[in-house]
Amino acid sequence: MWKNHLCIVMAIEHYNPLGVIRSLGEAGVRPVFIAIKGRAKIASASKYISKCHFVDNIEEGYALLQSEYGNVAAETGIKPFLFSSDDKDIGYLDYHYDELKDKFICFNAGKQGRVNEFMDKHNILELAKKHGLSVLDNRVCQRGELPEGLRYPVITKSISPTIGGWKSDVHICHSEAELLAAYEQIEAPTVLVQEYIEKQNEYAIEGFSANKGKDVLLAIASTYDYILPDYYSPLMTVTNMNNEPVKKSLEGMLKEIGFEGVFEVEFLVAQDGTLYFLEINFRNSTWSYAATKARMPLPVLWAETMENGYMRADARKDINGSFTAMVEPIDYAKRVKTGKIDKAQWLVEFKQAKCGYYFSADDVEPWRICVENWDNLG
């Protein structure tokens, strides 16, 4: 039974791993948490943690993982499950997969370095096209290089989330001059320059893949309740993922990659409703906990499916219509502090949200820490 395995969450202190910890805890499993320093000790405050280690970076966390838990499989005959929720963490672990595969059951694509291969934005866009998804025109450029045959405006992105300045490498440029100016601020040596269009919305799918990508559950889909030009929206509407053509394409991609783990797929919704594939995040996403609220706890279902060798027939649950999920301090900052709504209206919507990413009546200490650090987290 999967619950007989030690479960370890190694991630930056954030509400993302808090969702993993709560998903496991609500299923009766108290994980070990290797907490990499973040803005505030949010996830480590959860009552569901059995033991917490504090480290400064992924390298220190990896060394601790090996020294403290690297012998568990040899001593007990049962490999621990290892959960990831940060791009740099999964990228680092993927480059050490040969050292991990006999000791842990972790997110992977069958061989060392293969997850990183498809964290490369160009590679994953090409695979998406192969499997029939729409993709915006793009070029791979070295920093300072002007793309040929690409119409403006364009958007710049680091070629991989493990390289460069992540969000600080994202610039919208309306001309060659603006692109050259943006290069002065971009950290990544290799840049994806992509056609930019005004979006109607975004479409994020949360799921898991197991048994070399043969078992895939696309559990929920989220769209944003309001759009921000340069930031994700912290208020979303959650439904079942019911787009069959997209489902078929994504199942084909995940099987070809051979991915085993929890993931998120991001699409841009154009003004005419066209879905343009953006990327797959090969780790637990911030929005994953909404699937737990929909009775589909992805970390639990992934571990269970990996243990059993098959996905149970009732893994997918029907959502009765839709529900709202909220990143509380960020939504407050974006709407109340800017005067879009007042505190009274915000409190009404806060209470109506079925999923809070910080608040839980059953696990209150992270919420207390959140409130103490409200401005810092917003």
Q: Residue locations for each model-derived region?
A:
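ATP-dependent carboxylate/phosphate-activation module, predominantly the ATP-grasp catalytic core
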Residues: 177, 195-258, 281-306
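ATP-binding N-terminal substructure of ATP-dependent carboxylate-amine bond-forming enzymes
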Residues: 1-108, 373-376
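A short glycine-rich, hydrophobically flanked beta-strand micro-motif that places a catalytic Asp/Glu
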Residues: 260-272
